[in-house]
Amino acid sequence: MIMGQYLFWLANAHEPIENRIPELPNFISVLYHRFQHTTWAQFLHRWENIIFAILVASLISLVAYLGARKKEIIPSKFQNLLEIAVEKFSHLILEVLGPEGKAYIPFLGTLFIYIFTMNIFGMVPLMKAPSSSLNITAALAICVFCLVQFLNIRNMGIFGFLYHLAGSPKSMLEWLLAPLMFSLEIISQLSRPLTLALRLFGNVLGEDILIGTFALMGVVMISSVETFVGIPLQLPFMFLGLLTSFMQALVFTLLSTVYILLSMHKEGEKN
């Protein structure tokens, strides 16, 4: 009912609808529409992506705490399912990183669960997918970038890493080309978090816009009969959204795994 009212308001607002980005309402946007002149509503509206990101993190932490507290000698079907999922995920990471990758499974597993939960959070009524904000996806990409650079410096040393960025020159010609190689490698390093952030942001935002557009169409189609209950045209796309949410979380995690692999140099490459 609230969704229909809010989308109906969007369709009949004074601002032309073609200038708006169709998006399913969340409880913060509903409160802001009702109390937009109050300070607290403006604060919530300004920081809504951060608030939803914190809500997702809190929800995951709560579920993990409750799940860990109720350990059973004979595992339930749900616990068996989770154990199988963790085992498959760990096997996937170890296939890419090798035995040394065991240390990175907690980080990569947390990254996958957090991103996937954020992606599907927008499908919950009156919630929003925080990963549809570039600020959130950029923060995640920067975390991966910082970890990769830390591993590079730890494995090769600062000067060894700079030498690697220059293309590991040995001959005179290679030293002459070192500034060019250094510039290209810097661009390559910086493009990694940029592409990670933009890919996740663009796909999740596009998914939300698609669902919001069809939800709005369902309301507008029967607006003439003066009802706030629209046709659920967005329902098929929500099932598709579950698949794309999983795939985007998996792609982000696998690319992060590859970047970690590229930073795991052999001891002989240290300077």
Swiss-Prot record:
Membrane-crossing segments per the record: 47-67, 107-127, 133-153, 209-229, 235-255
UniProt signal peptide: none
Protein name: ATP synthase subunit a
Main location class: membrane
Coiled-coil intervals: none
One Gene Ontology molecular-function label: proton-transporting ATP synthase activity, rotational mechanism
Family: Belongs to the ATPase A chain family.
Domain of life: Bacteria
InterPro entries according to UniProt: ATP_syn_F0_a_bact/chloroplast, ATP_synth_F0_asu, ATP_synth_F0_asu_AS, F0_ATP_A_sf
GO cellular component, one term: plasma membrane
Subcellular location: Cell inner membrane
Subunit structure: F-type ATPases have 2 components, CF(1) - the catalytic core - and CF(0) - the membrane proton channel. CF(1) has five subunits: alpha(3), beta(3), gamma(1), delta(1), epsilon(1). CF(0) has three main subunits: a(1), b(2) and c(9-12). The alpha and beta chains form an alternating ring which encloses part of the gamma chain. CF(1) is attached to CF(0) by a central stalk formed by the gamma and epsilon chains, while a peripheral stalk is formed by the delta and b chains.
Keywords carried by this UniProt record: ATP synthesis, Cell inner membrane, Cell membrane, CF(0), Hydrogen ion transport, Ion transport, Membrane, Transmembrane, Transmembrane helix, Transport
Gene Ontology BP term (one): proton motive force-driven plasma membrane ATP synthesis
